[in-house]
A protein has these predicted regions:
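Rossmann-fold NAD(P) dinucleotide-binding segment
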Residues: 54-114
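Rossmann-fold dinucleotide-binding core
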Residues: 96-179
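Active-site-proximal catalytic alpha-helix in oxidoreductases
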Residues: 130-131, 135-137, 159, 163-198, ...
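Interdomain hinge/lid region at the active-site interface
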Residues: 168-171, 180, 218-278
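NAD(P)+-binding Rossmann beta1-loop-alpha1 motif at the extreme N-terminus of oxidoreductases
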Residues: 1-66, 89, 125, 159
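NAD(P)-dependent dehydrogenase/reductase Rossmann-like domain
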Residues: 276-296
Length: 296
């Protein structure tokens, strides 16, 4: 079969829009839908065909890619799309939906004869736009020739973790990775907040740890967003990070593990969102260290 596919992208937020662009640039026929159509319309300039409904978007699709806010949003969208889907269509489910959410989505796919791939991605706006995401994937071997060109267009690397997407092996790995990302993001914010409170130049702290085991590029990159007031457009937004943090906490609780750091990170993200930072980069959780909205 040709490696040029008809791909439907349902959800054109930060990640979905970038993925749709890269699929089109790779030569695939791309249809896109977003609940707020205006967010999808700029993709038309890249050759993406904008649909009015999920069902319209998935007509004649070889692969459907969902990348929406959460599991319920993905399920609701696929319920709208499924009347137009052919049995055997590959469904690449990249929404971070949590373990229970993935199981529910996989059951829906099974009911309607779809090939289900649990395929969350690692990366934020910049790697998404560059087509350099890491795709974490689990799903049946017999359909991988359909989804591999999609993964190659949006990512630099695909990590397979089994043949049963319903088990959520890829999502489980994503939750572990995100737990680390959230922990270091929260820690960076608190270090900056303490520096401000104590009158310490944070760049002096960066110099202190430079070249040692505590140094990391992520700390510097995220901190600069705060120090230079470059929190928009977000690489990954506070409100989405808060949602993912709660999925991590729930996954731990469901498996008998108490995740105090993830719980604290979730609370910080939620507090920052309530202060007005919901649509800023997740490092804006820095502001949760202060009782009132403050300048960085």
């Amino acid at each position: 079969m040709t490696d040029k596919l008809t791909v439907s992208v349902l959800g054109t937020g930060i990640m979905g829009a970038a993925m749709a662009r890269n699929l089109a640039r790779a030569g695939h026929t791309v249809h896109a839908w977003n609940r707020t159509r205006a967010k999808a319309e700029p993709l038309a300039a890249e050759g993406v065909r904008i649909a009015d409904t999920p069902a319209q978007a998935v007509q004649d699709a070889d692969v459907v890619l969902t990348i929406l806010y959460d599991g319920p949003a993905a399920l609701d969208t696929m319920r709208e799309a499924v009347p137009a889907l052919r049995p055997g269509t590959a469904w690449v489910q990249s929404t971070t939906a949590g373990i229970e959410g993935v199981a529910e989505l996989a059951a829906f796919a099974r009911e309607h004869g779809l090939l289900f791939y649990d395929a969350p991605v690692l990366g934020t706006r910049q790697p998404a736009e560059a087509g350099k995401l890491t795709v974490l994937a689990a799903g049946p071997a017999e359909g991988r020739e359909k989804v591999t060109p999609v993964f190659d267009a949006v990512g630099a690397r695909t990590v397979w973790s089994g043949e049963d997407g319903a088990q959520g092996g890829a999502t489980r790995l994503k939750l572990v990775a995100n737990s680390w990302v959230l922990a270091v993001t929260a820690a960076a914010g608190e270090a900056l907040a303490l520096s401000k409170a104590l009158g310490v130049d944070p760049r002096g702290f960066f110099d202190l740890v430079a070249g040692g085991p505590l140094d990391m590029g992520y700390l510097r990159a995220k901190s600069e967003l705060v120090l230079e007031d470059r929190l928009t457009p977000p690489q990954f937004a506070v409100n989405t990070a808060a949602k993912d943090a709660r999925l991590i906490v729930q996954a731990g609780a469901d498996h008998g593990v108490r995740l105090d750091v993830a719980e604290a990170a979730a609370a910080r993200m939620e507090r920052a969102a309530a202060q007005g930072h919901a649509d800023e980069d997740m490092v804006a959780a820095y502001f949760a260290s202060f009782d009132e909205k403050t300048d960085s």
